[in-house]
Every structure is written in C-alpha cells, then in structure tokens.
Design a protein with these regions (language model features):
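N-terminal nicking endonuclease/strand-transfer module with a His-rich metal-binding environment
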Residues: 1-206
C-alpha cells in the first residue's frame, strides 16, 4: 500500500553538518571538503541506486559536478551558524516501476525547485526494496554565470511547505494512476482528512 511521507530540514553548520559530507553520504560518493580538509568516503554505502544533479538555466556548467557544487556552497557561507542547504526526504510509492518512480521524482523537483532557481542534488535509495525513497538537497542562494549570489529569503517562506507537500502527492498519484493503480496518497494528516487512524511509521533515512 502506498504511503505518504515528506519531511524537510535545514542542513546547518551550527548543527555540526557539512554540505560536502551530507552530499557524499546521500550520493554514496568520495568527496574532499576543501574547507575542513576532511575526505568523506561513502563509496561502500549500500542502497544508493542513483544520484542526479538538476540545475536551472542560469547555473554554470561546473554546478553539475557534485564536489565542486557543494564545496562552492561551503565557500559562500562564512558564518558558524550558516544554513548550507535545505533537504527534502520523500517516500516513493513502491508500486511504481523504477523508471516511472525516478521520472516522477525528477518532475516534482524540476517543477517546484529548479524552476525557482534552486540547484537540486537528488539521491535515490533502495529503489528495488520495500522502502524506496529520495533525498533532495537544495541550494539556498541564487546562482548565475559567476556562481552563487545572495540568499533567496523567499525560499524560507513557510507557506511553501504546504505547496510542496501537496505537489508531491499530486505527482505521485498521477504516476500511480498511469501505472494502473486506483489508490492515492494524501499529504494531509489523518485528522485533517477526518479519519480516525494511527499514522504509520516511516522507516527513516538510509
């Protein structure tokens, strides 16, 4: 049975996170963090099916290189409490064929984030098992031919969260219908749907 799960968080330096380390972990890559000098090697991490970088038309070509991208993000942030990236984690209906699941996630990302100027680093995990999901790391600064500019504060508007959550449900439900399934997922809580049910437990990140 398809379930709905979409969570959001900020990857911040004050919480001890590194954008480079986070991207390396999610993509199953080996990356050098030029700011700290640390090498993060997650090439033996299991479950990583694919990692894809999507960029807006304004982004220079080097932004499709994962190491260059996230090291540039680190260099653009000088404060100890800098917000480095936004992450969205979403569950993918396991009923969907892998190709359809992949394209559904990428279409959702293009429509909601890349079209607004964000760069998205999308990692697909456990696509052949019972917990297929995607991690989406998003940049927080405007990007142009010369690289990163100022922070785009509008992207932090809390009203976007509801829009993004509803959009994922719409994309997933269209894909389920195209695959011949009648069931749908709903981004609203059981309480908002008027249902007396106990929420399911998402298996969590991996």
């Amino acid at each position: 049975m398809a379930i709905y799960h979409l969570s959001m968080k900020i990857i911040s330096r004050s919480s001890g996170y590194s954008a480079v380390a986070s991207a390396a972990y999610r993509s199953g890559s080996l990356m050098l963090d030029e700011r700290t000098g640390l090498t993060h090697d997650y090439t033996r991490k299991s479950g990583v099916a694919e990692a894809v970088i999507l960029t807006p038309a304004t982004a220079p070509a080097w932004c499709t290189n994962r190491a260059e991208l996230w090291n540039a993000v680190e260099k653009a942030e000088c404060r100890k409490n800098s917000q480095l990236a936004r992450e969205i984690e979403l569950a993918i209906p396991r009923e969907l064929p892998q190709d359809a699941a992949r394209e559904t996630v990428l279409a959702f990302v293009r429509e909601n984030f890349v079209s607004q100027g964000m760069i998205a680093d999308v990692a697909f995990h456990h696509m052949d098992k019972t917990n297929p999901h995607a991690h989406i790391m998003l940049t927080t600064r405007a990007v142009g031919p010369a690289g990163f500019g100022g922070k785009v504060r509008d992207w932090n508007d809390r009203t976007h969260a509801e829009t993004w959550r509803a959009s994922w449900a719409d994309h997933a439900n269209r894909a389920l219908a195209n695959a011949g399934y009648q069931e749908e997922i709903d981004h609203r809580s059981y309480e908002r749907q008027g249902l007396e049910k106990t929420p399911g437990i998402h298996l969590g990140k991996s």
